[in-house]
Amino acid sequence: MLGKIVTIAAVAAGGMILSKQLRKSRESGKATIEESIEVNVPVSAAYNQWTQFEEFPNFMKNICEVRQLDDTHLHWRAEIAGKEEEWDAEITEQIPDERIAWHSTSGAEHAGVVTFHKISDSTTRIMLQMDYSPKGFIEGLGDAVGAVKLQVRTDLQGFKDFLEAHGSETGGWRGSVARH
């Protein structure tokens, strides 16, 4: 009997937390994710690989395609919540070995920054912050239960595994984009 009461209480508490998260997401319209990972490569290798956007489908499960249109514009195609989505993004700042910032210009509304921090000559901490606006009930629910945060964490782990397995970056763009 006590076990049933504890289970019912846990389900009720979980429902209250989920309801609160859904309400918070709906009220603000925005959600923020912050994740980091340490990669066993020099900072230049981590940064260079991150600039190879067209390689993202190799380690980001939901990304189907990324086309780099020019130095600052990308077209993305992904599967989100079981349906295909497309959007364009603009790189708003790029400093070699330090940071890359972006925002969407069409489709799913989001913006973010990824930064690269030298831990040692052979270890880099990658920190990602992304703000986005979940669309509709399914994406809002995914946000509320932490599915998007888990996907970002999985994608960062995929990047780490991809880069460490290759031993070095597959290319790199060392140009800068002034903040705008």
Q: Across the structure, where does each feature detected by a protein language model lie?
A:
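Hydrophobic ligand-binding cavity/cleft-lining segments
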Residues: 3-77, 158, 164-167, 178-180
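Beta-strand/loop substructures that line and gate deep hydrophobic ligand-binding cavities in soluble
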Residues: 2-5, 93, 103-161, 165, ...
